Each structure stands twice: as C-alpha cells, then as structure tokens.
UniProtKB/Swiss-Prot annotation:
Compartments where found: Nucleus; Chromosome, Telomere
Biased composition (Basic residues): 548-560
Protein name from the UniProt record: ATP-dependent DNA helicase II subunit 1
Chain spans, region Disordered: 541-560
Primary location group: nucleus
Quaternary context: Heterodimer of Ku70 and Ku80.
Organism: Cryptococcus neoformans var. neoformans serotype D (strain B-3501A) (Filobasidiella neoformans)
Taxonomic lineage of the native organism: Eukaryota, Fungi, Dikarya, Basidiomycota, Agaricomycotina
Family: Belongs to the ku70 family.
Function: Single-stranded DNA-dependent ATP-dependent helicase. Involved in non-homologous end joining (NHEJ) DNA double strand break repair. DNA-binding is sequence-independent but has a high affinity to nicks in double-stranded DNA and to the ends of duplex DNA. Binds to naturally occurring chromosomal ends, and therefore provides chromosomal end protection. Required also for telomere recombination to repair telomeric ends in the absence of telomerase. KU70, of the KU70/KU80 heterodimer, binds to the stem loop of TLC1, the RNA component of telomerase. Involved in telomere maintenance.
Transmembrane region(s): none
GO molecular function: ATP binding; ATP hydrolysis activity; damaged DNA binding; DNA helicase activity; double-stranded DNA binding; telomeric DNA binding
SMART domains: Ku78
Alphabetized InterPro entries for the sequence: Ku70, Ku70/Ku80_beta-barrel_dom, KU70_core_dom, Ku_C, Ku_N, SPOC-like_C_dom_sf, vWFA_dom_sf
Amino acid sequence: MSSYYNKGDAPSWEALDQDGLDDVIDTSEPSAVAEDPGNYQPGNYVFQTLRTINAEEMKRLVKLMQTAKEQYEAQDDDETVETTEPEILRKTFPPIEESHEMNIANVIQTCNFLFRDGGTQLRGNKRVFWITDNDMPPGMNNRQPARTSYGDLTTYGVTAETFFIDRPDHRFNPNIFWNDILDREAIDYNDDQPDPEGLSSLADLMKDLVIKTSPKRTHFHVPLKLGKDGEIVIGVSGCSMVSEQGKGASRYVKMRGQVVEEVQSKTEYTSAKSLNSGQWGSNPIKVLGFQAASQLRFQDNLKHPFFIYPNEEEYTGSTRTFAALLNSCLKYNRHALALCRLRSNHVPEFCVLIPQEEKTSSNGQEYPPGFHLIILPYKDSIRPPPKKVAEFLQSPPIATDEQINAMKAVIKRTRFKAAAYRPEIYPNPSLAYHYDQLQALAFEEDWDPEDPAKQALDKTMPLYGGMHSRAGEFMEEFNKEIENDERAVEKLAAPTKRGKAEKETTVNEWDLRNIPDMWKKGTLSQLSILARLRLRRRPFTGQNQKGGYHRRRIRTSFHK
C-alpha cells in the first residue's frame, strides 16, 4: 500500500493562524469510502478534508498513530513472527486488491478536488507532501493522465514536496516514474545501500522548519490627494512591511462545567458628544511636493514602513493615476513628501513616499511596483548621540593588519551556512513558549519548563560548542593580538585622598549660575564663600588688603 500525505495551506509545516490539513490514502478499498455525491476518486480514502486544524482531530490522529506504534512494537518482541502492518491501520484503511488498483492520476485529481473545495478560505502557500516507497506505482505505463492532473494542480499554485522511502532490500529510484510526472530533471541514481531510517529526511524537515507566521493583512485604505488643494484623489491601500508579532488577545473563559466556554463580553457606548470630541477629520495622504533622493537621511527612518498600492474600490482609475505617479518619480529620481493620517483620530504626521520599480525574474515577480511610506520624526523626537560616542566616531582607532587578518579567520568560520540571515527560522522565544504551552493545554499534556525539549524552543541561543570547535584557536590568536596592542593597556592612577579644604570647594557650577533662583527657593545657605570665589576665579589664600571687601560684596550680590 502506498500512502500519500497532503498538507495544504502551509509550506514545510509553516503554521498559520488558520492552518489547513487533510490526509489522503491511496489504494484503499472503495467500500471503505462513504458514498457521497461530493466524493473523490474511488480507491482514495480522504481521512480528513482540508480545513482548519483543531485539537480534537489532532488527538484522533495521535491516538491512531500511538495505537499503531504499540501494535507494531508488540510484533518486534516475538522474533518468531514476521512483522506485518498494524491491525488498526489495516482496519481503518483497508487495502485494495492488486487487480483493482487505479491510476496514480486519481490521487492527484483528489488533491485538486480538495483544494477546489477549500475555496477562498485557503491562505498562504499550498503544498502537497508525497510520502511513498513505491517507485513503480499503478498506471505507470499510461503517464499522460498523471501529467495532466499534476499540471492542473500547479495552476492552483500548489507545489509538491516528495519524501521517497527506501525499502530494506531496495533503494528508491525516482527516475523510473516520479521525476517524469513532477517535471523534474533526472538525477544520478546509484544502487547503494538503502537508507535504514526511511523517513529521516522528513523528520529533519519537521524538526528544522516548524515555523509559525502571521497572515499578511491590509492595514489601511485611505485616499491619496494630489495637486493644488487635493484636486486629484485616488484610493490606496497599505500593508506593513515589518510588524511585531505578539501574543493573541486574552479572553475570559468559564472553566467550570462540562465544556470550557468563552465568557461573552458586553460593550457599552458613551454619548455622541463624548465620541465626537477630539476628532481630527478624515484620514488622507496629501502630497505636499517632491524631493531629490539626496534629501533623505538614514537616521530619519525610525518607525516600521508601509507599502502602498492602488485600490479601485473607492475611486475608479486609481491604478492608472498611481502608475503615472510612480513612473514619474522613477524617471526623475524623486520621492514625494506628504502629510498623512493613516487611521482615524490619529495625529497627522509627515512622511515620504519612496518609489519602487517592479522587478521580475525567471521565477516570476520579485519586487512589486509601489511606494514605501516612511513616517518622518518630529524635531522633538530626535536625540543627539552622546558626546563620547560622537568623538569616538570622528576619530576611531584603526586596527592593525594582523588584527584584521585574525578577525577575518574568525568570521569566515562562524558565518551562516546559507551565507544569509533567515529570520523565519528564528522565532520569538517568548511566543514559542507561549504557543507550546497552549498546545500542551489543548492536548491535555504536562508542560515542564525544565524539559530539554522545551529549552530547545529558544532558537536564538548561540551554539557556543560549534563556534569554539570551528574557530576557537583563531579567537585565541585574535585575543593575543589585542593584548599585545599598546593602545589596549590602561594605566590606573592610584587614588588620592581628598582633604577637608578640597571637599569644601567642590561645587556644582549650575547651582552657582542660578543663585537668584536659589535665594527665592530658600536654599542659599547650601553655598559657601569658597564656592563663590571659585566661580568668580578669585584667589582662595592670602590676606585681604581691603579688609572684608570680598565678604561684603558677595553678601550683597546674594540678595540681588
């Protein structure tokens, strides 16, 4: 029996808020499939249609696989009995007779029907996981129906992920049938020792690519005004390019009773006068003018950017006008300066609209056409860097050639394997713990924070062992170069004891410059004569020739 596992709406276990899953088992007894007008191809057992995953269905699958595992392990205990298929799998998915086996195209057509029935509810990427150990499936002599069905599947935007399993006495050869059907190039096949693990590649994929992503949503629909006094108005929509993903909104639930129920909240509205107070009016994007690219500063990009594109729902012809504006900005290398209010009752903000040209490749569109909307900061929001940092940046110390070469060796051996940073494989540790706890609660499992598997949820922890094994000796060489540098040696002066007279002369110059204010506040007694003399740059020692002139003059100035 060959099994084909179909997982829709998520690539490589990339879980969405509404992840869809369905299971298709081929070469099953037709009588095991319920007779239904909407039924799929005969001989294919649809264990679960493509719909949102819930805890009850996952529990049913887990229980089925646990029972099958127990039955299979029970056969291993008796060496005199040959291991066979677990009874629960044969009962749940009864195999069809070899004389009634159907063409493999029926399985692909069933996948087509599943995605078709899912309709517009399917979001994100769509993939089919093919798991089989049969490199010569039924109907391989007539391949045209399978090619046609797979072509129809790709028109839905569905791709196939194959996991071919080696048998103990046979190595799987995809060149016989599957590479031809899936429109893949033939590989160099060698009849080596079969892989004893079988599903090792699938296990590695499940371990490394368990990713949770948030669905991409449009953040706002606003009008874009051009010309004098906004004579030209078009509709635009914007989506966030970078958005911080947080935990879901908390909800109150009623734990008592047979079923956990959500508590229904009641919302009360205030009077219309209270709601209308502080209204800022409509929320458009009004173009004020155009600037050259040299007017932009990198440090002014403080907030998350938005990407805007035309929206024809409110204003007809928005796409044509939007394209003309985009092409003009690209032609003259200009960006638009605008005043925007993206949400109702928000304070207006200045922004720039940076054009982006469409770029395509052999794989399709890489960069869509549109504008990047970047919020500009107000003057009060800008802070200068610390004085020491500014001085350091003006004249930074220059490393020697030996130090540079030593660090090059360290960087070369500690870089990413893919030579690029992939943020999708580094989930937020806090969210990873949160979702894992929710999963344990849904499946009624214990959650132990000391479990090594739970500690491994934090993918941001550096792999110190691998780093030191690859670049440990080069790190030591770099440290030696730094230690031998004379600039890294600091001479610490011995601390000196401060005398009583020196303590009395310590004063805050800012307080001395605000003596009239201190007199008004009644804190003038905190100052001393010596402190005042220090500010006036008068001598501290020596005999006063004019007899008390300083004391009288200072006292008089205190009361002014």
